[in-house]
Amino acid sequence: MASTFSKLLTGRNASLLFATLGTSALTTGYLVNRQKVCAEARDQHKLFPPSADYPDLRKHNNCMAECLTPSIYAKLRNKVTANGYTLDQCIQTGVDNPGHPFIKTVGMVAGDEESYEVFADLFDPVIKLRHNGYDPRVMKHPTDLDASKITQGQFDERYVLSSRVRTGRSIRGLSLPPACSRAEAREVENVAITALEGLKGDLAGRYYRLSEMTEQDQQRLIDDHFLFDKPVSPLLTCAGMARDWPDARGIWHNYDNTFLIWINEEDHTRVISMEKGGNMKRVFERFCRGLKEVERLIQERGWEFMWNERLGYILTCPSNLGTGLRAGVHVRIPKLSKDPRFSKILENLRLQKRGTGGVDTRAVADVYDISNIDRIGRSEVELVQIVIDGVNYLVDCEKKLERGQDIKVPPPLPQFGKK
């Protein structure tokens, strides 16, 4: 219910108050009262016990729904981060979206760096479930951006059509996209593009604001897999990441269109190296070199990326913690993709398949997007090498099937570098 003071601020009453009290006094009083009203509204749910607020997850199939219990919910429901982010905001996207037909989604997001600590009783088991047993309570995440360690990074281009490596980075001290204010999002954009202006050589390029693009230009970039899609995915909309679109969103790319930075989509930044063909070693070398240079330029301006030794690089979705890295190829495998052993082969190689256009798309002309399923517990070098070895195995299987030969399901890869 609106307070008497709030009602006074409507219609002609507001004008009279401005004239009588003066702008400064009224503004101060209004802001104080508004903060009180917002706090009261946020605390309304506390009038009910946690059991009355517990979400109905009986038909859900995501990691959050599998890990959340009434006792965990009761323990965490009334906690908030320093930025005011709550457990219910973390899990809302998973409550609104029971599951996915092709992949098991996480079902929750973080609103800021502190979310992973304040709500660790839920985030930690979700991370362990999603990341093949990685336990952030006792394990430490390795980082390695030495591209010279990669071997056999050239694919057979009769099968592999394109190669790509991406990651995300978050700027410490600013809320993540689910909780980002307009001012914070604009600050992310400003920090990023100011740093990117310092890139030289083959990394040099320019920034394009989404708000200044035509619809035709946007769609062309989306179709060419350069630009993120419009904010229609349930993850973005239900988690609040589509707010104020397209304000403070954009894409930076070098003049060769092989090194890209997305600004303010699911994460503060997405750093991408890509090119046609099968030279994954060259793509990864450019990725490592560009990422290191971007971080150096960010730090020169007094900022840093969110990182800790338990979780690695901090990003919005727990699925991207650690390296945040997804190394992928578009590969044409018409025979293997129809073999009943295909899914098991991918599982044992720690790979996942998506349609030609990514998540929620189908394979066109038997072309699949194949990438690493893990993000945390292994270094960037390890994950890219897993993709290289795995895709070479898939191509070898395709060639054997073309010759009428049998193929084998490989043994499962050991966890986290264990021998």
UniProtKB/Swiss-Prot annotation:
Membrane topology field: Peripheral membrane protein
Keywords, sorted A to Z: ATP-binding, Kinase, Membrane, Mitochondrion, Mitochondrion inner membrane, Nucleotide-binding, Phosphoprotein, Transferase, Transit peptide
UniProt superkingdom: Eukaryota
Family annotation (InterPro entries): ATP-guanido_PTrfase, ATP-guanido_PTrfase_AS, ATP-guanido_PTrfase_cat, ATP-guanido_PTrfase_N, ATP-guanido_PTrfase_N_sf, Gln_synth/guanido_kin_cat_dom
Binding site for ATP: 162-166, 225, 270, 326, 354-359, 369
Pfam families: ATP-gua_Ptrans (PF00217), ATP-gua_PtransN (PF02807)
BP GO terms, sorted: phosphocreatine biosynthetic process
GO-annotated cellular components: mitochondrial inner membrane
Reactions catalysed: creatine + ATP = N-phosphocreatine + ADP + H(+)
Modified residues (Phosphotyrosine): 255
E.C. numbers: 2.7.3.2
Transit peptide segment: 1-39
Enzyme class: transferase
UniProt domain Phosphagen kinase C-terminal: residue ranges: 159-401
Location of the Phosphagen kinase N-terminal domain: 46-132
Record PTM Phosphothreonine, positions in chain: 356
Protein family per UniProt: Belongs to the ATP:guanido phosphotransferase family.
Stated name of the protein: Creatine kinase S-type, mitochondrial
Species the sequence originates in: Oryctolagus cuniculus
Lineage, broadest ranks: Eukaryota, Metazoa, Chordata, Craniata, Vertebrata
